[in-house]
């Protein structure tokens, strides 16, 4: 499943603590690949900012996003399943930065090509606060193989909404 681009990443266990962020709704293979890459880079601790509140309002079908507790638990469970010795710190974030601009012990931030600007923004904020710059590690996100589209929680929520609406229609037709 590893793409050739992965070879550009630092070797395993290169950093004491790494950070990454995301919504992590309906934990899917794209999330697992992203979390696995981050876990492999971390020696001691992985900090995962899980989007909540205002960070969710612009998401498609945001009303269908799993509760924050469930998403954080799924992240923690998955990371522990692949690297049990890591300290996993999943926490809700309500802005694009979360712990990445206050935790002075972080050494690297894991991003996708799409979220690279966010990683650069984190380093600008860290510089303003007198914190060290994080090494930015870019993970190539996997596509779903069949269509070549990036795996997306929004797509999964949309499919779920469409399925729910189709199931509702026959019941409504019988009622009329």
UniProtKB/Swiss-Prot annotation:
Pathway: Cofactor biosynthesis; coenzyme A biosynthesis; CoA from (R)-pantothenate: step 4/5. Residues 145-176 are annotated as: Disordered. GO terms for molecular function: ATP binding; pantetheine-phosphate adenylyltransferase activity. It is an enzyme of class 2 (transferase). Inhibited by CoA. It is found in: Cytoplasm. Transmembrane segments: none annotated. Its EC number is 2.7.7.3. Keywords: ATP-binding, Coenzyme A biosynthesis, Cytoplasm, Nucleotide-binding, Nucleotidyltransferase, Transferase. The keyword Cytoplasm applies. One of its GO terms (cellular component) is cytoplasm. Signal peptide: none annotated. Disruption phenotype: Plants are severely impaired in plant growth and seed production, but almost not affected in the accumulation of total fatty acids per seed. Residues 157-176 have a biased composition (Basic and acidic residues). One of its GO terms (biological process) is regulation of coenzyme A biosynthetic process. It catalyses: (R)-4'-phosphopantetheine + ATP + H(+) = 3'-dephospho-CoA + diphosphate. Residues 145-154 have a biased composition (Low complexity). InterPro entries: Cyt_trans-like (IPR004821), Rossmann-like_a/b/a_fold (IPR014729). CDD domains: PPAT_CoAS. Belongs to the eukaryotic CoaD family. NCBIfam families: cyt_tran_rel, PRK00777.1. Reversibly transfers an adenylyl group from ATP to 4'-phosphopantetheine, yielding dephospho-CoA (dPCoA) and pyrophosphate. Does not accept 4'-phosphopantothenoylcysteine as a substrate. This is Phosphopantetheine adenylyltransferase. It comes from Arabidopsis thaliana.
């Amino acid at each position: 499943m590893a793409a050739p681009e992965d070879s550009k990443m630092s070797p395993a266990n290169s950093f004491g603590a790494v950070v990454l962020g995301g919504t992590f709704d309906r934990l899917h293979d794209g999330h697992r690949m992203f979390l696995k890459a981050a876990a492999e880079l971390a020696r001691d601790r992985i900090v995962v900012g899980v989007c909540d509140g205002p960070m969710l309002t612009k998401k498609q079908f945001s009303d269908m996003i799993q509760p924050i507790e469930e998403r954080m638990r799924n992240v923690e469970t998955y990371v522990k399943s692949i690297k049990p010795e890591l300290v996993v710190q999943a926490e809700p974030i309500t802005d694009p930065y979360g712990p990445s601009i206050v935790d002075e012990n972080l050494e690297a931030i894991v991003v996708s090509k799409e979220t690279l600007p966010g990683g650069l923004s984190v380093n600008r904020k860290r510089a303003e606060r007198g914190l060290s710059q994080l090494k930015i590690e870019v993970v190539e996100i996997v596509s779903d193989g069949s269509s070549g589209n990036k795996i997306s929680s929004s797509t999964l929520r949309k499919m779920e909404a469409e399925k729910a609406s189709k199931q509702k229609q026959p019941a409504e037709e019988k009622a009329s």
